[in-house]
């Protein structure tokens, strides 16, 4: 989508540039998002936008659904395609979490609606944590492949059930009680934050 600011009417005009399908696929025993395919579609959209508007494009913003994430290894490579929130690996994980951190206390730290799809419960069942160096939520993952920069954007982080409601930072108690590696999490940034430019390689491609 290309958005054009119309100063006279103080409105934004939206134009669809590229549309594509997106379905979860069963890979390695789990329902996963085909990240490479999605990123290729994103690049196609950028190519179309730049072909039509060129230097008139002043910024790029990424938005996706919440709770799902990708893990990067020490070399900055995506370990595996992100597992979809509809995968059944989280069944029973919420009750398992409440054995370590009672529901009422949990809610005092992260006042989210309790759902098994939330990131906290996905991570309890995650098998790649030992290999992981960074966790990026879906929009953060696209931003990383666009710019090379690693951040966790606040609105997506807020769906994780790992963010303290009052401080808006990662909650030490939740990570400690659930035995989750807090070092995977990145600096929190807010919507509209400028994080960088397209990598030279990607800029040449699009």
What are these regions (language model features)?
Residues 21, 43, 47-50:
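Short amphipathic alpha-helical segments enriched in leucine
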Residues 35-42:
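Phosphate/oxyanion-binding active-site loops and adjacent basic polyanion-contact surfaces
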Residues 1-35, 77-85:
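Short glycine-rich, Thr/Ser-proximal phosphate-binding strand/loop in the N-terminal lobe
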Residues 47-206:
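Glycine-rich phosphate-binding/catalytic subdomain of phosphoryl-transfer
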């Amino acid at each position: 989508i290309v958005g054009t600011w119309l100063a006279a009417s103080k409105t934004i005009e939206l134009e669809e540039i590229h549309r594509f399908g997106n379905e979860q696929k069963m890979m390695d025993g789990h329902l996963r998002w085909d990240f490479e395919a999605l990123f290729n579609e994103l690049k196609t959209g950028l190519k179309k936008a730049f072909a039509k508007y060129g230097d008139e494009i002043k910024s790029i913003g990424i938005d996706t659904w919440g709770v799902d994430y990708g893990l990067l290894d020490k070399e900055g490579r995506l370990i595996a395609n992100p597992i979809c929130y509809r995968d059944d690996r989280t069944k029973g994980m919420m009750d398992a979490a409440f054995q370590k951190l009672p529901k009422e206390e949990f809610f005092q730290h992260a006042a989210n609606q309790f759902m098994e799809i939330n990131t906290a419960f996905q991570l309890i069942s995650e098998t790649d944590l030992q290999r992981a160096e960074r966790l990026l939520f879906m929009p953060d993952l696209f931003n990383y492949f666009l710019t090379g920069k690693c951040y966790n954007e606040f609105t997506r982080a807020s769906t994780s059930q790992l963010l303290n409601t009052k401080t808006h930072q990662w909650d030490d108690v939740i990570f400690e009680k659930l035995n989750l590696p807090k070092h995977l999490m990145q600096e929190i940034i807010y919507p509209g934050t400028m994080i960088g430019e397209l990598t030279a390689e990607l800029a040449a491609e699009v």
